[in-house]
C-alpha cells in the first residue's frame, strides 16, 4: 500500500485539516489557500470512500453534513440549562451585588462576558471527541442537533490530550452580521421569507433537518460555560482553558475584583458594541467562584449567581424612500415608511410605522428625508425623528391620498377621529385583510392560510367572505400554484379544527371595529352565548365595565347589519360551532393584569390568552385598580409606575406558576 493511502496518512490528513480549520475559523489566520484546503479535503473524502472503516468521529468531513434526518429526538440535559435574570438599570445591578454579598458574607470576584443574542446549546465530549449536542429546549430537555452542530467550523470535533476525557461546554450559536445579510440575500433570490434578525436565522437553521443545508450557512459559536471534573474554582479560568483547547470564546471575558470595576467594564463593552461583528443585547455578570455559585444556587428558572445587564435600544439612520399606504380590514388607511434597509438591534429593518397623517405632520416627515429609526421595546420599528439638516431641497409636505390606493374610491376622514377610511364595501384590500385577521393567531388561528393564499383564493373567485372558507374543497385549493394535495388537506384540516371555537375568540375573529380580546371577554363573560350578544341593546352594552359609548355603538351597529348576521348564519350552517362561555373558578378570576416587556418563549398574545382563560383581565396601563404587573425582558415605564403605586410585580416564573402554565 502506498504511504499516501495508508491509515496513518489518513489520520495525519485529518489532523492537518483540523489545524487549518482552527487557524482559519478561530484565529482568523489562514496558513494555506482555499484551493489547497479543498484539494486536501477532496483527498480525505476519497480515502474515506475507499476505506469507510477508517473514518473517525472527529474527521473534518463530518462538518460537511450527514444525510437529512426525519426528525430530532428529545434528550434530557445532564444538568438543567436555566435562564439568566435581566436587569436594566444601575439600581438593579446594585441590588444584585448587595444580594450576592449578603448571601456569601463577602465580596466576590465577577466575570463579565458579552451577551450574544443567539441560540443556547449544550455540547458533550467523551474520550475528548464530540459525541452529542442538544438545544436548550425547556431547560430540562432539548433536541439532539449533533449533526447540525458538527457543521460549525470553529468548534473542535476533538480535544487535545491535556483536556479531560469527559466534559460539557455550553455556548451561543449565532450568525455574524455579514453572514446574516448573505443568507437573507439568498432567501430573497429564492423568493423565500427573509429572516427578521440573526437570532431567528440561527434558530431556524438549527431546526433544518438537512445538515448539508446547515453547513452552507456558516453558523458560528461562542462558548460561555464549562462543566468538567477537577478542582478548578474559577469560571474565568475555565473559559481560558476552553480557549487553550481550541474553543471560540467571544469578546475577551473580563475578571473584575469589585462592583465598581464591573460597571466600568459594562461601559467599555457598550462603547465597543457598534464595532462588534455580531449582535449583542447586553453583558452577563457572573460570580467567578464555582463554589460560591453552588452556595447561591438557583430559583426554578434563574441562576442566583448571574445577571444579564441589558443596554438601551439602538437607533439607526437611514433614508425614507417612500411612504406607502396600506388598507386594513376595517378600511382604515395606514401610512408606512419604506426605508433603505438598515440593521437595527439585530433585525434588518425596511419598514416602519408612521401611525397616521397627523403624526406625519407633527414630526414633519417627508419622502427623501434621512430619518432616525428605533424599536419600541426593541420590537416594533418606528421613526423617532427627522434629520432636517440632511433634508434635500424641494421636499414636499406629505398628505394622505384622496382615493383608496386599491379600489380608487373616495376616502373619508371620520368625525372626531384621525383615521382616514375607505368605505367601499367591495374593496378587495379590506376584504382580504378581514379574512387574514379572521384566520390569524389572535382569532381562529387557522394554519397555512397566509396572505398570498388568501389573495389567490380571491383572484380565483373561490372566496369573497370569511364564511366561504368553510366550503373550500381540496380541488379548490389545488388550483393555487404550488399547493399540492397534501398541502391542501393540511389547510382543510386546520379549517375543520377551527369550526369549534370559544365565544370570545369568535367575537374577536368577526373584526368588529374597536373590539379586541379584552372587550370580547367582557361580552362573552356577561352574555355567555352568541345569540344573547347579538340581541343585546345599546343600554345593556353600555352598562358593562370597560365598554363606553363608542364601543357599545360599534357592537350594536355591527349586529344590526343583516349582511353580518347572514354571514354568521352561513358559518353555522357550514358546521361552525360557537361554544358558550363558562366562567373560571381560578384564583386569577377578576384580577387585572398588565404586561410590560418581552416574555421568554411566550408571545404577548399567548400570555394574554392564558390570563383570560383563567378569568383574568388584561389592561394596557397601570393604575390603582391593577392587581399584577407581569415583568418580561426590556420592561418599560409601566414597571416604575407599578413600584410607585405598590402594585404586585411578577417575574415570568411567578407568573407561570400563578396561571399554572408549567
Swiss-Prot record:
Binding annotation for NAD(+): 34-38, 83-84, 113, 136, 172, 286, 310
Residues annotated as binding Zn(2+): 404, 407, 422, 427
UniProt similarity note: Belongs to the NAD-dependent DNA ligase family. LigA subfamily.
Its biological purpose: DNA ligase that catalyzes the formation of phosphodiester linkages between 5'-phosphoryl and 3'-hydroxyl groups in double-stranded DNA using NAD as a coenzyme and as the energy source for the reaction. It is essential for DNA replication and repair of damaged DNA.
Coiled-coil positions: none
EC number: 6.5.1.2
One BP term from GO: DNA replication
Source organism per UniProt: Chlamydia pneumoniae
Cofactor or coenzyme needed: Mg(2+); Mn(2+)
Keywords carried by this UniProt record: DNA damage, DNA repair, DNA replication, Ligase, Magnesium, Manganese, Metal-binding, NAD, Zinc
Domain of life of the organism encoding this protein: Bacteria
Encoding gene per record: ligA
Active site residues according to the UniProt entry: 115 (n6-amp-lysine intermediate)
Catalytic activity: NAD(+) + (deoxyribonucleotide)n-3'-hydroxyl + 5'-phospho-(deoxyribonucleotide)m = (deoxyribonucleotide)n+m + AMP + beta-nicotinamide D-nucleotide
Gene Ontology terms for molecular function: DNA binding; DNA ligase (NAD+) activity; metal ion binding
One annotated Gene Ontology cellular component of this protein: cytosol
Domain BRCT: start-end pairs: 583-662
Signal sequence annotation: none
Protein name stated in the entry: DNA ligase
Amino acid at each position: 500500500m502506498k504511504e499516501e493511502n495508508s491509515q496513518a496518512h489518513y489520520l495525519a490528513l485529518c489532523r492537518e485539516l483540523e489545524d487549518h480549520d482552527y487557524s482559519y475559523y478561530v484565529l482568523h489566520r489562514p496558513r494555506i489557500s482555499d484551493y489547497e484546503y479543498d484539494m486536501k479535503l477532496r483527498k480525505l473524502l476519497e480515502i474515506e470512500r475507499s476505506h469507510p472503516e477508517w473514518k473517525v468521529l472527529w474527521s473534518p468531513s463530518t462538518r460537511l453534513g450527514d444525510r437529512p434526518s426525519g426528525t430530532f429526538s428529545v434528550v434530557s440535559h445532564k444538568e438543567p440549562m436555566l435562564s439568566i435574570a435581566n436587569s436594566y438599570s444601575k439600581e438593579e445591578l446594585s441590588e444584585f451585588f448587595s444580594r450576592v454579598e449578603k448571601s456569601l458574607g463577602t465580596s466576590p470576584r465577577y466575570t463579565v462576558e458579552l451577551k450574544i443574542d443567539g441560540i443556547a446549546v449544550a455540547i458533550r465530549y467523551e474520550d475528548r471527541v464530540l459525541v452529542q449536542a442538544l438545544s436548550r429546549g425547556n431547560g430540562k430537555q432539548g433536541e439532539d442537533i449533533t449533526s447540525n452542530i458538527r457543521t460549525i467550523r470553529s468548534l473542535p470535533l476533538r480535544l487535545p490530550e491535556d483536556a479531560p476525557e469527559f466534559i460539557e461546554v455550553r455556548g451561543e450559536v449565532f450568525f455574524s452580521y455579514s453572514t446574516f445579510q448573505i443568507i437573507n440575500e439568498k432567501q430573497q433570490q429564492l423568493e423565500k421569507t427573509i429572516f427578521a434578525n440573526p437570532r431567528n436565522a440561527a434558530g431556524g437553521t438549527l431546526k433544518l433537518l438537512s445538515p448539508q443545508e446547515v453547513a452552507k450557512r456558516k453558523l458560528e459559536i461562542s462558548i460561555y460555560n464549562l462543566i468538567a471534573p477537577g478542582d478548578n474554582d474559577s469560571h474565568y479560568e475555565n473559559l481560558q482553558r476552553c480557549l487553550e483547547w481550541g474553543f471560540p470564546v467571544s469578546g475577551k471575558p473580563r475578571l473584575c475584583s469589585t462592583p465598581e470595576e464591573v460597571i466600568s467594564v459594562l461601559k467599555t463593552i457598550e462603547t465597543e458594541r457598534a464595532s462588534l461583528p455580531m449582535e449583542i443585547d447586553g453583558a452577563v455578570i457572573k460570580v467567578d467562584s464555582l463554589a460560591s455559585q453552588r452556595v447561591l444556587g438557583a430559583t426554578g428558572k434563574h441562576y442566583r449567581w448571574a445577571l444579564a445587564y441589558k443596554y438601551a435600544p439602538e437607533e439607526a439612520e437611514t433614508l425614507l424612500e417612500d411612504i406607502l399606504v396600506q388598507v386594513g380590514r376595517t378600511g382604515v388607511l395606514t401610512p408606512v415608511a419604506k426605508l433603505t434597509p438598515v440593521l437595527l438591534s439585530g433585525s434588518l429593518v425596511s419598514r416602519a410605522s408612521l401611525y397616521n397623517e397627523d403624526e406625519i405632520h407633527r414630526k414633519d416627515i417627508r419622502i427623501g428625508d434621512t430619518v432616525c429609526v428605533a424599536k419600541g421595546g426593541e420590537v416594533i420599528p418606528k421613526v423617532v425623528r427627522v434629520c432636517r439638516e440632511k433634508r434635500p431641497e424641494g421636499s414636499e409636505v406629505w398628505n394622505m391620498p384622496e382615493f383608496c390606493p386599491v379600489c380608487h374610491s373616495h376616502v373619508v376622514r371620520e368625525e372626531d377621529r384621525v383615521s382616514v377610511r375607505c368605505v367601499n364595501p367591495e374593496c378587495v384590500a379590506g376584504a382580504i385583510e378581514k379574512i387574514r385577521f379572521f384566520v390569524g393567531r389572535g382569532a381562529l388561528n387557522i394554519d397555512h392560510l397566509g396572505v398570498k393564499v388568501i389573495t389567490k383564493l380571491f383572484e380565483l373567485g373561490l372566496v369573497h367572505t370569511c364564511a366561504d372558507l368553510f366550503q373550500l374543497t381540496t380541488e379548490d385549493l389545488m388550483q393555487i400554484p404550488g399547493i399540492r394535495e397534501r398541502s391542501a388537506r393540511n389547510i382543510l384540516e386546520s379549517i375543520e379544527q377551527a369550526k369549534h371555537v370559544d365565544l370570545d375568540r369568535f367575537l374577536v375573529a368577526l373584526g368588529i371595529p374597536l373590539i379586541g380580546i379584552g372587550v370580547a371577554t367582557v361580552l362573552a363573560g356577561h352574555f355567555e352565548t352568541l345569540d344573547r350578544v347579538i340581541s343585546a341593546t345599546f343600554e345593556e352594552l353600555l352598562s358593562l365595565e370597560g365598554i363606553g359609548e363608542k364601543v357599545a355603538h360599534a357592537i350594536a351597529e355591527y349586529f344590526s347589519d343583516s349582511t353580518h348576521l347572514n354571514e354568521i348564519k352561513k358559518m353555522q350552517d357550514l358546521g361552525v360551532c360557537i361554544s358558550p362561555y363558562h366562567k373560571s373558578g381560578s384564583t386569577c378570576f377578576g384580577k387585572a393584569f398588565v404586561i410590560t416587556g418581552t416574555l421568554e418563549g411566550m408571545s404577548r398574545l399567548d400570555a394574554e390568552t392564558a390570563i383570560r382563560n383563567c378569568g383574568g383581565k388584561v389592561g394596557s396601563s397601570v393604575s390603582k385598580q391593577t392587581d399584577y404587573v407581569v415583568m418580561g425582558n426590556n420592561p418599560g415605564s409601566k414597571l416604575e409606575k407599578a413600584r410607585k403605586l405598590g402594585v404586585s410585580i411578577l417575574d415570568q416564573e411567578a407568573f407561570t406558576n400563578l396561571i399554572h402554565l408549567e
